[in-house]
Structure formats: structure tokens, C-alpha cells
Amino acid sequence: MNIRKKTRKIYIGNIAIGGDAPIIVQSMTNTDTRDIEATLKQINQLHAVGCEIVRLAVPDANAAKALKAIHDASPLPLIADIHFDYRLALTALESGIEGLRINPGNIGERKKVVTVVDAAKAHKASIRIGVNSGSVEKHLIDKFGGPVPEAMVESALNHIKILEDEKFYEIKVSIKSSSVLDTIAAYRMLSKSCDYPLHLGVTEAGSLIRGTVKSSVGLGILLSEGIGDTLRISLTEDPVEEVPVAWEILRALGLRRRGPEIIACPSCGRAEIDLIRLTKDVEACLVNEKTPLKIAVMGCVVNGPGEAKEADIGIAGGRDKGIIFAKGKVIRSVHGQDKLLNVFMEEVNKVIAEYNTTQ
């Protein structure tokens, strides 16, 4: 792991981004923003699973008008995703939205950009410049022969300069491609070229499995190199599925922890319990738990306690029985497979309570 690059600190609402702030988990609603009730429901669902900032699409004036009601009831800071019509950005800022995601170059003539920047200053809002490989300007595609990393970086730097020329520095930048390798290359170049906080993502990553793999590889490499201040896992799924993936990437790299880490063996012919079901049941019981414990679910009593000796608590199954252990030592035996989950969760809850009283 490389030391994380110290970028310029900005704020989205009360959330610090960059500098010495932790890496922040974001997502984006996929509801019709004009449907206030549905959008707030999804924002609350995202909040419940650990999302810290939410972006909303603002495609038209009616969506922009809905933002105030959404903002006023939202438990999280919000970013309005704006393209082409600068008036939507102004309405969003007047609604209290904490941040914008725009490309200054597609807002229109310079005076429109200046109007948006002045409004962002007045409302103490930040602006994310979001460059995607599919939206690189034609002259840069012609110059570089395609939407290659060099073209994306030059596009981002050009957009940054537009804001800097207006003395605006509350900037965050993203530079995404559907290609993992291009995404990595682009962020590496951009990180060397500016000190603004970077929002990481692989765009159009795909469905749950494919998108998780692509994002984990791409973002994991960048984060391990000290690059990145916020991240979003883009999945063709309910956005609630994105957030746990982001947290697991951060956990795997030792950057942040949220909730229990559940480790489980892959199962083999020695397993004498339904290990897959037991693991899923334990995960379901702890889905909303925030205590950062390590919990092991192992398939057999031969190797289970030893293999999971670093776990705070764990269970190893045998023929119609299970052994519960803590830090590798047996603390309780359970007879009857139908009792394993309930008894194990009793012990887990004791450990959680003990942990929380010592913090």
C-alpha cells in the first residue's frame, strides 16, 4: 500500500472530501427525481447501508423543482447531476443542494458558466467535473485518435481551468471509462497533474458480478496506490447493492471498516452442515450491524477454530453439532443443527455488547 496522496480538502455539506478526510462512499439514485416519495425512499435505503453522499439526475425543470422537498427531508448531502441547461444548476443550488456534477464545457457560453460558478460560491456548494470516455470532446478525440486516457485527462484539465479562471476551487474531479485499464491509466495521470480530490469509478461497469469485479480491480489498484478520495461502484442493479461493495473494497485494503467482517470457508466434502445457508443467515442477521467485528463461519470442527483464530467469534460445524469459538478457543458447543444459528447469534450479540461498552 502506498501512502494516500494528500489532496485539497473541500466540503459537500458537512462531509469533508480530500485532505486528511476518510475516503467517502457515494451512490446515485435511479428513481425518477420528479417522484419525491420514491426518491426519498431510495435515499433512506442508501443511508441505511452506509452511503454517505447521494447524486440525483436532474434532466428537466420538473426534476429540479422537486429537489427542495427531497433535500429538506434527506439524511445525506446531495449532488445534482446537470447537463446542458445551466438553469437547472441554479434551481438545484437555490434548493439547498450541496454539490453539482457538471462539465463546464457543455453548459454553454462562458457567461452561463460564470452564473453557475457565482451561484455555487454564494451557496457554498462544490462542483464535480465528471469526464467519461463517452463524452470526450470531438477535437480531443481527433487529436488523440480516440477517447484514450490522455484525451480524458486533457478534457478534465481544460474544464478545471474554466472554473479556476473564475477563482473557483471547490472542485472534485472524476475521469471514468468502461475499460478498467484506461480508467487506471487516466486517474494515474490526473493525480500527477492536479491536487483536487478525485472521485473514483468505472463507468458502465455492468451487472452485479461483472460490475463488482471490474470496479474492485480498477478501484482497488488505484486506492492501493494512494489515489482517490471518494468512490462509487456503478452497477446495473438497485443502487443499494453498490454501497456494500464499496465498503468491502475499503475494508479489504485496510482503509475503512463498517460493520462486521464475515469470513467463511469455501466449503468442501468435510462440511457436515449446510454452510452456505448458515453463512447467509448470519449475514442477514447482521446486515444493519455497525460494530466492526471479525466473525467466522467455518464448515468443520477439524480446521475451523485454527483457520479462524483471529476472529472475534466464530462457529465451526460438525455432524449435527457446532462449536463456537472466540480468538481460536472453544467457548461453547451446540447440539442440533436447527439450533446453530440462534445459539451462535446469542454469543455474537454478547461480543457486540461487550465491544460497545469498551469503546
UniProtKB/Swiss-Prot annotation:
Keyword Nucleotide-binding found: no
Alphabetical GO biological process terms: isopentenyl diphosphate biosynthetic process, methylerythritol 4-phosphate pathway; terpenoid biosynthetic process
Textual note on the cofactor: Binds 1 [4Fe-4S] cluster.
Name listed for the protein in its UniProt record: 4-hydroxy-3-methylbut-2-en-1-yl diphosphate synthase (flavodoxin)
GO MF, any single term: iron ion binding
Cross-referenced Pfam families: GcpE (PF04551)
Function: Converts 2C-methyl-D-erythritol 2,4-cyclodiphosphate (ME-2,4cPP) into 1-hydroxy-2-methyl-2-(E)-butenyl 4-diphosphate.
Necessary cofactors: [4Fe-4S] cluster
Keywords recorded for this protein, A-Z: 4Fe-4S, Iron, Iron-sulfur, Isoprene biosynthesis, Metal-binding, Oxidoreductase
EC number(s) stated in the UniProt entry for this protein: 1.17.7.3
Alphabetized NCBIfam families for the sequence: ispG_gcpE, PRK00366.1
